[in-house]
C-alpha cells in the first residue's frame, strides 16, 4: 500500500522555546537572578548578609562582619581592578550614602559573579523563563499530553540548571585589606576564587575563615603581638596629653 504522510503546521515545542527565550527582556533575566539570590541565608561568621544592594546606603556601617552579594550586573574578571564589581565594592567600602564616609571599612567582604559565567547563566535563565511561559500558556498553545510532560520535565531541569550555574557564577570573593608594612592608609584587595557545590554564602564563609579575612576569635597573645607591631614599631613610648581642667 502507498504510505501517507502528514505535516503539523504548528511550530515544534523546542522552536517555540527558542523563539520565546530570544524575546525575554534583560531586566526580567536580572530580576529572576536577584530573586534566587535573595533566598541565600546569613551564616557565621557574618553578622549580616546584604544581597544586591542598590546603593552603599543599603549596607549598615557597624562593628560587625558583613557579606555583600553584588548585583548580577556588577561582574568581575580575573585581574581586572576596574571591573564593575570592583567599582561597586569600592563605593560601598568607602561610603554610606552619598555624603557620609564609611567608618568600619574593615567589616565588609564582597562576592561577585564572573563576567563570562554570568553571560552563560543569563542564557540559562532565558530558557527557564521561556519554559515557564509555555507552561503558563499550555492551554492557549493547545499542548497535547506528550508536550505537557516534556514541558514539565524541561522546566524542572532548567530550574535546577539555573540554581547550579548561579552558585558557580558567584565565584569571586573580594577582600579589602591594608598592608601594615607598606601604607596603612591605602586599601588593597585580594580576589580569590571560591568554588564547590555549596551555597554562595557557605563558600565565602569557609574561604574567609581559611584566609583569616574574618577571625571570629583571637587568642590574647596573638592580639598583643599584633598591637605591639603597630604601637612600638618606631618608638618605645606613647605620648599622653594632659587632661583639660
Predicted features by range, described:
Residues 1-245:
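Extended alpha-helical scaffold and adjacent linker segments that couple domains
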Amino acid at each position: 500500500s502507498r504510505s501517507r504522510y502528514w505535516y503539523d503546521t504548528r511550530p515544534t515545542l523546542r522552536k517555540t522555546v527558542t523563539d520565546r527565550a530570544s524575546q525575554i527582556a534583560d531586566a526580567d533575566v536580572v530580576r529572576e537572578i536577584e530573586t534566587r539570590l535573595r533566598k541565600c541565608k546569613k551564616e557565621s561568621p557574618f553578622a549580616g548578609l546584604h544581597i544586591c544592594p542598590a546603593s552603599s546606603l543599603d549596607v549598615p556601617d557597624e562593628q560587625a562582619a558583613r557579606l555583600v552579594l553584588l548585583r548580577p550586573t556588577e561582574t568581575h574578571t580575573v585581574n581586572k581592578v576596574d571591573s564593575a564589581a570592583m567599582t561597586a565594592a569600592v563605593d560601598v567600602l568607602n561610603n554610606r550614602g552619598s555624603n557620609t564616609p564609611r567608618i568600619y571599612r574593615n567589616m565588609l567582604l564582597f562576592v561577585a559573579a564572573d563576567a563570562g559565567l554570568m553571560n552563560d547563566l543569563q542564557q540559562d535563565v532565558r530558557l527557564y523563563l521561556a519554559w515557564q511561559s509555555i507552561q503558563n500558556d499550555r492551554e492557549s498553545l493547545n499542548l497535547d499530553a506528550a508536550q505537557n510532560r516534556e514541558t514539565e520535565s524541561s522546566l524542572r531541569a532548567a530550574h535546577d540548571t539555573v540554581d547550579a550555574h548561579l552558585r558557580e557564577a558567584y565565584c569571586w570573593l573580594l577582600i579589602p585589606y591594608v598592608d601594615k608594612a607598606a601604607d596603612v592608609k591605602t586599601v588593597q584587595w585580594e580576589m580569590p576564587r571560591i568554588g564547590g557545590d555549596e551555597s554562595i554564602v557557605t563558600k565565602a564563609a569557609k574561604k574567609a575563615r581559611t584566609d583569616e579575612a574574618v577571625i571570629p576569635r583571637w587568642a590574647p597573645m596573638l592580639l598583643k603581638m599584633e598591637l605591639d607591631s603597630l604601637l612600638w614599631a618606631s618608638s618605645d613610648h606613647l605620648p599622653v596629653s594632659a587632661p583639660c581642667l
